[in-house]
A protein has these predicted regions:
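N-terminal pre-domain/capping segments
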Residues: 1-89, 93, 97, 159, ...
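A short acidic, helix-capping loop that chelates divalent metal ions and anchors anionic groups
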Residues: 36-41, 72-76, 106-112, 173-175, ...
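Active-site beta-loop-alpha junctions enriched in small/polar residues
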Residues: 6-10, 33-37, 68-71, 105-107, ...
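Active-site acidic/histidine proton-transfer and metal-coordination neighborhood
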Residues: 16-17, 55-59, 74-164, 173
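Short acidic/histidine-rich active-site segments
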Residues: 227-233
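Charged helix-capping and loop-helix junction motifs
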Residues: 44-50, 78-86, 114-122, 151, ...
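Acidic/histidine-rich catalytic cores of soluble enzymes
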Residues: 19, 29, 66, 123-212, ...
């Protein structure tokens, strides 16, 4: 198993600091939040991307994925969505990252219409991603919270460069047990995103193991040769404790869960 954390937990932090923290606490990689308020995003210049690669190489830390905000199931024209997908794929390729994260975003649409949008756009985006050695991962999130909902889309796309990102919070909120999520997502899974919260109504992040999410079951269902990525949502919950103080405990907790299922 390899371990990463998301830079969502370090809002606005320089990449060098994120990479240093990852290396110091035994994390193999970073999930890079690709938003204009962060150091790296689709608008970053070639020189900035090259500098980022040097920083990461020096720290011995990989980029697991580029976390974008494209909503592939949303209403509207296709071309703006496809342009965002292409930009995210190019950024991932420049950072030597294997994955791009996207959201469904189909709230307010009939399920059939949202699925049709997602299938069409992911099919086109995957064809582009394949040429760059990148996979586009649809996260279990918002309108498609469960593994079953995401798998229904991806089964129709049926391209190797379109896959799934399993966010264990959202499948839990959707009432789907981890074993069922794993069964649904198995043909498509890119990696697993872990986190913890106090309850379904109190989503302020807490340290791994300090909340109510079924993390032991999720880790037991995760592929042994895959990645676990801790997404600590500090950006959306400023009052939450600072991530650096919990990295060592979080990494050790995940390792214990992995060891327990060997």
């Amino acid at each position: 198993m390899k371990y990463a954390f998301s830079t969502l937990g370090l809002p606005g932090a320089p990449l060098a600091r994120s990479a240093s923290l990852a290396a110091a606490h035994g994390f193999d990689g970073l999930e890079i939040r690709a938003h204009p308020e962060e150091p790296l995003h689709p608008g970053s210049a070639a020189a900035e991307r090259a500098a980022a690669r040097r920083t990461l190489t020096a720290a011995g830390v990989a980029v697991l994925g580029v976390a974008g905000y494209t909503r592939v199931a949303a209403a509207g024209a296709d071309e703006p969505v496809l342009a965002e997908l292409r930009a995210l794929v190019r950024l991932a390729a420049d950072l030597e990252a294997p994955f791009v994260r996207v959201f469904p975003g189909g709230a307010g649409l009939p399920a059939a219409a949202a699925d049709a949008h997602a299938v069409r756009r992911l099919s086109a985006g995957a064809a582009f991603a394949e040429r760059h050695g990148v996979r586009i991962l649809l996260e279990t999130h918002d309108s498609h919270r469960t593994g079953a909902a995401v798998a229904e889309v991806l089964d129709r796309v049926a391209r190797p460069a379109a896959g799934a990102l399993w966010d264990v919070l959202h499948t839990w909120l959707g009432g789907e047990p981890p074993a069922a999520s794993r069964r649904a997502l198995a043909p498509h899974l890119g990696y697993v995103q872990v986190k913890d919260v106090r309850s379904a109504r109190e989503l302020t992040p807490v340290g791994l193991g300090a909340g109510v999410l079924p993390l032991a079951e999720a880790v037991a269902a995760a592929p042994r040769d895959g990645w676990l990525c801790w997404e600590y949502e500090k950006r959306w919950h400023p009052a939450a404790a600072e991530l650096p103080g919990g990295l060592a405990r979080g990494r050790a907790y995940l390792e214990r869960l992995v060891a327990a299922v060997r």
